[in-house]
């Protein structure tokens, strides 16, 4: 087997309420994914708060480095949500802004990075990251499953049609799900995709086009573009999720969670867990308990 000589990195979008979870993710990457770089994009107002995580292979960056100068974040919430305003777009929800940051990372990270793996703050890596499990015969993994249960699937497909002017046949999109932790984006593919999106915008800006798209999914957009436009250039398809999804509210104690994690990690396909919080209320298991549950893997 040839040695891997490409440069890859992990990318995380985070903010202040997820600081402790992101800190635990960093700890797990230190143990299992060194020496790969890890870029952490945070809201501008949280940049100073996250400086403790700017060490070693971890690089904290402001999300505004990706956003165009003409986007303005409202300092207060409307209808319970933060919005970004610009003279060229509809009001943009913060979760759409985070997607824009994922798509635009290659504009601001180091030029030697060929591919990135997007990983959520709420993930914990519990097994060594072996790139050979995600890179085969010169191609990176592209997660795709036919077990499509995404509630917003129809919206995601309509967004793709809008971005690419119906260039992809409907039946090639309807049955597939591209969402998983981790999702890999290749620089060459991403730059090609954003260039194509820009073509249909009056200002030749993929960011304006994307911001004016209703309910997009960055993973659906990238996956469908690579599969149907680029014909799997730089990618191969795999339907195994690297991180097992667990609902935080299903666990009350660290012991209960530890038993589940131990069972999950008996499966060789998983390299970690994704413990997602729901409404971030008192019923959710704390990061401290999650860390205690993972102690035997991380020590």
Which stretches of residues belong to each language-model region?
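GT-A fold catalytic core of metal-dependent nucleotide-sugar glycosyltransferases
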Residues: 101-142
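Conserved catalytic core of nucleotide-sugar-dependent glycosyltransferases
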Residues: 129-209
């Amino acid at each position: 087997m040839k040695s891997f000589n490409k440069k890859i990195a992990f990318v995380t979008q985070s903010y202040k309420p997820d600081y402790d979870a992101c800190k635990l993710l960093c700890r797990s990457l230190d143990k299992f994914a060194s020496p790969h770089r890890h870029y952490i994009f945070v809201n501008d107002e949280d940049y100073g708060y996250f400086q403790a995580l700017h060490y070693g292979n971890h690089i904290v960056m402001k999300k505004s480095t990706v956003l165009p100068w003409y986007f303005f974040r409202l300092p207060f919430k409307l209808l319970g949500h933060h919005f970004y305003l610009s003279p060229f777009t509809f009001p943009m929800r913060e979760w759409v802004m985070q997607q824009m940051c994922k798509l635009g990372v290659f504009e601001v990270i180091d030029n030697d990075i060929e591919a990135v793996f997007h990983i959520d703050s709420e993930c914990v890596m519990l097994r060594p990251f072996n790139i050979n499990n995600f890179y085969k015969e010169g191609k990176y993994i592209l997660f795709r499953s036919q077990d499509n249960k995404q509630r917003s699937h129809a919206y995601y497909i309509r967004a793709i049609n809008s971005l690419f002017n119906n260039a992809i046949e409907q039946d090639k999109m309807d049955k597939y799900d591209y969402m998983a932790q981790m999702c890999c984006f290749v620089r060459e593919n991403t730059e090609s995709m954003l260039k194509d999106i820009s073509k249909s915008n009056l200002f030749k800006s993929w960011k304006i086009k994307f911001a004016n798209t209703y309910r997009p999914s960055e993973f659906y957009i990238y996956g469908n573009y690579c599969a149907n436009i680029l014909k799997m250039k730089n990618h191969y398809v795999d339907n195994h999720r690297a991180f097992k999804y667990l609902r935080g509210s299903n666990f009350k104690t660290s012991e209960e969670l530890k038993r589940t994690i131990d069972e999950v990690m008996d499966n060789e396909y998983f390299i970690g867990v994704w413990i997602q919080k729901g409404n971030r209320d008192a019923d959710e298991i704390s990061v401290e308990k999650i860390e205690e549950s993972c102690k035997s893997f991380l020590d």
